[in-house]
Amino acid sequence: MNYIQWNYEDDLLAGTTLRDPSLPENNNMALHACLRKEDVLNNRDTLSKALHIASSQWTFAMQTHSDHIHEVTAADAGRGYRVYEEGIADCDALYTKERNIAIGVFHADCVPVLLYDPFTGIIAAIHSGWQGTVQEITRKTVTLLMQKEHVDPAHLMAYIGPAIAYRSFEIQQDVIDRIRAMSFDTRDYLTMLPNGRAIADNKGLNMQMLLNLGVER
């Protein structure tokens, strides 16, 4: 199984699974975007065994390109692993203070952002397509952690995973307008094209939100 591993400390296990032609549906992990649910569940089970994480320890959401954030508690453990509709409803960012719970988001072109605070042990997983980005879900997640959980953004570690390449993400005027209306200067992340469209750096926009809040690692 192909994956990128991001480990900052021995007690943190984080990363991104990748396409793998040797596995069913190229290692697809998403129940909401698959041909056969059985293949996705087999892929999830293969990953769980490789990581020594039980299926009852995972928690997933029903992603809707929202700016909704959910704190995962022990009562949420196992939700969304085998049945998509049992996942956290209408949510695109998860975080938890619980140990031995795995959280994750599903992405292809969209930007995945993982956060870890080594001082509090809090972890977060954010799914940010362009809709989530213009709603500033990454900024809102960090702000919630600061205000509710008293996280110091200077302590946060951030990982921005694979997503659509900057030069491949062409957008029309409606999306251009929404990016320009964000709460910070986004000009460096838009390149106008002769056809009136633009290419947008979705990863860069999420990175800038982190930097604006004092997350620098």
Where are the predicted features?
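Active-site microenvironment for binding and transforming phosphate-containing groups
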Residues: 1-217
